[in-house]
Amino acid sequence: MAQPTASAQKLVRPIRAVCRILQIPESDPSNLRP
């Protein structure tokens, strides 16, 4: 599990982009709730 799969990397990029746009910390799961 040390190396993320290609599909995981494809998901991480948009997720981090959204977090940056919404200005929410990625490490805080409570902020990811709708």
From Swiss-Prot:
Domain of life: Eukaryota
Disease: Hypotrichosis 4: An autosomal dominant condition characterized by reduced amount of hair, alopecia, little or no eyebrows, eyelashes or body hair, and coarse, wiry, twisted hair in early childhood.
Gene Ontology BP, a term: regulation of translation
Keyword Transmembrane helix: no
Keywords from the named record: Disease variant, Hypotrichosis, Translation regulation
Gene behind the chain: HRURF
Consequence of changing residue 26 to K: In HYPT4; uncertain significance; increases HR protein expression; abolishes the inhibitory effect on HR translation
Protein name, UniProt field: Protein HRURF
UniProt key word Oxidoreductase: no
Function description: May function as an inhibitory translational control element that can negatively regulate protein translation of HR gene.
